[in-house]
Amino acid sequence: MKIVRAALLATCFAAPELAAAQTLQGLPPGPLGQAIQRGHDMMMNSSGSTEAKPYVGNALNCSSCHINAGDTSTPGNFRETASKFPAYSKREGAVITLEDRIANCFMRSMNGMRPSTDSSVVVDMAAYINWLDKGQPIATPPAPSNPSPYPAMLKAATPADVTAGQTVFTANCAACHGTDGAGLGSFPPLWGPKSFNAGAGLANIAKLATWVKGNMPLGNPHLTPQQAFQVALYINTRPRPDFVLSQHLAPGHDYNASVHAETDTVASNLQKAGLSLQSLTGGP
């Protein structure tokens, strides 16, 4: 059993490096195809890319959340993403483009500086996402047929859910992400200074629960909705970097938003749901 487990982990550890070297098939010839390939490669190895690294402030890659550079059918995929933009963003209070969304991810999920939307990094990633969308209809996607159970679970969350989430984490996540959530090998940190900040999309517990339910454990997602929620609650009550918008915008930035002041913390994210970090964890 230990031999099989070790072999499985070795395969998983090697997978990101193998995928990063993948040559995409069916690309258009010339500069556009080259841009698409670069966009894919930067997503697979953002923190190791010469072009993307200056905008990355943690130990994550885009593929840490967008598995296989988003070329999957699970939550976090990029299929049919380009056709959803331009779109109104409540967070920014503005109609934003795909390029805006990519640039904003760098300062939130990657905890780095926001690149300009006309930078080669953003343009190449947008080219890749658009290529994945080839042949897809340009239309507003239908609303989910079944409402998410997680907002209601969040409103009713108790310290017992945090404790249960730690148990789920230990049994299903710690082998790859470490008991301290700092990540092991090529598996990313889930909290702490090298993970996504409190302004990231996955800092939203309901969104993280949806992502976990569809993707984790890697290669064998099998958690119940309650387990996915509890482990998401546990992860998002751990320490992570605060998000202060002004600290992620370079002079002369092209941030497309009507909201120009934003600060998010682990505690403030819970307060938005009517919860107290201290009550849930006994911490400060």
Predicted features and spans:
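Surface-exposed patches in mature extracellular/periplasmic domains of secreted proteins
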Residues: 49-55, 113-118, 138-142, 220-226, ...
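A structural motif
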Residues: 98-99, 133-144, 175-183, 201-208
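Post-cleavage N-terminal segment of exported redox proteins
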Residues: 1-48, 87-162, 238, 272-284
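A cross-kingdom marker for long, charged
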Residues: 239-284
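Sequence/structural segment immediately N-terminal to covalent heme-attachment motifs in c-type
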Residues: 31-69, 149-187, 205-206
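Secretory-pathway/luminal and periplasmic proteins that interact with or process carbohydrate-rich
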Residues: 49-52, 69-75, 132-137, 238-245
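Amphipathic alpha-helical interaction segments
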Residues: 57-60, 64, 120, 124-127, ...
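Extracytoplasmic electron-transfer domains, predominantly the class I c-type cytochrome c fold
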Residues: 33-38, 42-44, 71-115, 125, ...
